[in-house]
């Protein structure tokens, strides 16, 4: 089974528009050589084998002023990590907890 972070990863970064009150639930680190930042951040060519702490996938959560909330998986590969072991794994459990809270009628409150 693959991991929850693969190609097309996104990270929490207030300088790029992430809400300052967002909670980073988990992060992937130490990706394989050749992984890149988001395309919007690549302004020139250069070596891609230099360690870069900004190459990561962040699972984030934040509340909105209207009583809603946002969960961002941080990677297109997240969905592929749900089914291993018959959905009996940490990613499936985390996702289930998030979905149960999202269908709850109680509004979220801003911190």
Per-region residue spans from a language model:
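Extracellular ligand-binding/catalytic regions of CAZymes and related secreted enzymes
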Residues: 1-111
């Amino acid at each position: 089974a693959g991991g929850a972070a693969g190609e097309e990863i996104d990270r929490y970064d207030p300088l790029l528009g992430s809400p300052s009150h967002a909670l980073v639930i988990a992060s992937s680190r130490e990706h394989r050589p050749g992984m890149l930042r988001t395309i919007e951040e690549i302004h020139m060519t250069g070596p891609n084998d230099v360690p870069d702490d900004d190459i990561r996938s962040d699972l984030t959560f934040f509340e909105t002023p209207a009583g809603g909330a946002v969960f961002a998986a941080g990677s297109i590969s997240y969905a592929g990590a749900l089914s291993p072991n018959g959905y009996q794994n940490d990613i499936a459990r985390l996702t289930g907890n998030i979905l149960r809270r999202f269908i709850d009628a109680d509004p979220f409150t801003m911190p």
